[in-house]
């Protein structure tokens, strides 16, 4: 299990990462990583970065077969 400090350190080294990448790198369940990231966001230590749907060909995620899978959510330190 990873601590919040390890999550912070990995984000500092990598710049920005997805929660799934953090979970795999730290061998920690993703719900725990999600909770730590949300807590870090509430403390003002991390920020959520969402990609724009500019790469979407149709512009409509509802009709996209992948749903909103094309909209990635990244995390970075403030």
Curated annotation (Swiss-Prot):
A Pfam family per the record: FeoC
Entry keyword annotation includes Transmembrane helix: no
Gene3D superfamilies: Winged helix-like DNA-binding domain superfamily/Winged helix DNA-binding domain (1.10.10.10)
Top-rank taxon: Bacteria
GO MF term set: DNA binding; iron ion binding; iron-sulfur cluster binding
Family membership noted in the UniProt record: Belongs to the FeoC family.
Physiological role: May function as a transcriptional regulator that controls feoABC expression.
This protein's name: Probable [Fe-S]-dependent transcriptional repressor
The species this protein was found in: Enterobacter sp. (strain 638)
Gene: feoC
